[in-house]
Amino acid sequence: MARVKRAVNAHKKRRVILERAAGYRGQRSRLYRKAKEQVTHSLVYAYRDRRAKKGEFRRLWIQRINAAARANGLTYNRLIQGLSLAGVQVDRRILAELAVHEPATFASLVQTAKAALPANTSAPKVAANA
């Protein structure tokens, strides 16, 4: 059986790892073993954070909607409840965009939600200053 020489493949494998590690600090960009460990961890972080990003954006949208809703006299949960009762199907991303870029349109959605809510539920609770 013929002998297999691995020099070309080994050099290519190491070069690919070191290219991926370009820009890392210190030994992590220059030494193969350290670079390999860091590239592996970086791929794990990237995989994890691609999934975490979705939740982070949802939380950001909810904060923006809540701030704009409170400026219009409703809390976030009452706004969502009112829109649901009114049959308005707008997702949180679009609501947040409207709240930031088109306040008049968002205010009309708040009025629609207020009209759909039962009585005595549209006013947000005010914290008592004791």
UniProtKB/Swiss-Prot annotation:
The keyword ATP-binding does not apply. InterPro entries: Ribosomal_bL20, RIBOSOMAL_L20_CS, Ribosomal_protein_bL20_C. One of its GO terms (biological process) is translation. It comes from the Bacteria. It holds the Pfam family Ribosomal_L20. CDD domains: Ribosomal_L20 (cd07026). The keyword Ribosomal protein applies. PANTHER family: 39S RIBOSOMAL PROTEIN L20. Belongs to the bacterial ribosomal protein bL20 family. This is Large ribosomal subunit protein bL20. It comes from Clavibacter michiganensis subsp. michiganensis (strain NCPPB 382).
